[in-house]
Amino acid sequence: MTERNTSTDSPEKRAAGIAAAGLVSSGMLVGLGTGSTVAYTIKELGRRVREEGLDILGVVTSYQSEMLAIEAGIRLTTLAQHPELDLAIDGADQIDSELRAIKGGGAAHTREKIVSVSARRFVVVADESKTSKQLDKLVPVEVLPFAKEPVVKKIRELGGKPQLRSAVKKDGPVITDNGNFVLDVEFGVIKDPEALALQLSSIPGVVEHGIFCNVSELYIGNKDGAIKIITRQK
């Protein structure tokens, strides 16, 4: 089987992705995230399915991860059939010292969040470049096209600077797997991610935003293959 080449090889991402795959055992229901680091997790799980007889069911967060999982030989299910998962594994665009994350660079954050909160344990895989003391990157906000301008107005009232995400290989805006637009919002340093998350969620027309405050553990990969594991403090 020829697997899709998902990204330029990265020792750090590979180390983190493969280490997280080691958390999975037969009988598990596993949420499979989207992005270059979790692609290594999906490939490793596929190897274990083929070579070790690993028996799992995966729930994917995007068409990209669905294609990777199918190519890897992972059997898939849905949240409609299995609304509670044992584990979800995903990447992040940025994650702070208290394991609050920004996700959504791939415009899949709505499904990623639904899958992550459906899991008993949510593990983020990343390299050191994604870690930061505080969150300060652009926050993706998925919005209904009908509500774009009212949402832009409300976000500006919160101090944000929203920009409609444009597609790279076609004219017009990025359209999510759910058929919506994405606003990339600059807030500067986000001093209280939990509060901002609640404010964004309360805006009518916002489908979901990219602030994740439910990460259980962070697996950070290094070039030498070593892994640093950080667990959320209770």
Curated annotation (Swiss-Prot):
Its EC number is 5.3.1.6. Gene3D superfamilies: 3.30.70.260, 3.40.50.1360. GO terms for molecular function: ribose-5-phosphate isomerase activity. It catalyses: aldehydo-D-ribose 5-phosphate = D-ribulose 5-phosphate. Pathway: Carbohydrate degradation; pentose phosphate pathway; D-ribose 5-phosphate from D-ribulose 5-phosphate (non-oxidative stage): step 1/1. Substrate binds at residues 34-37, 90-93, 103-106, 130. One of its GO terms (cellular component) is cytosol. Keywords: Isomerase. InterPro entries: NagB/RpiA_transferase-like, Ribose5P_isomerase_typA_subgr, Ribose5P_isomerase_type_A. SUPFAM superfamilies: D-ribose-5-phosphate isomerase (RpiA), lid domain, NagB/RpiA/CoA transferase-like. It holds the Pfam family Rib_5-P_isom_A. It is an enzyme of class 5 (isomerase). One of its GO terms (biological process) is pentose-phosphate shunt, non-oxidative branch. The active site is at residue 112. It comes from the Archaea. Belongs to the ribose 5-phosphate isomerase family. Catalyzes the reversible conversion of ribose-5-phosphate to ribulose 5-phosphate. Homodimer. This is Ribose-5-phosphate isomerase A. It comes from Methanosarcina acetivorans (strain ATCC 35395 / DSM 2834 / JCM 12185 / C2A).
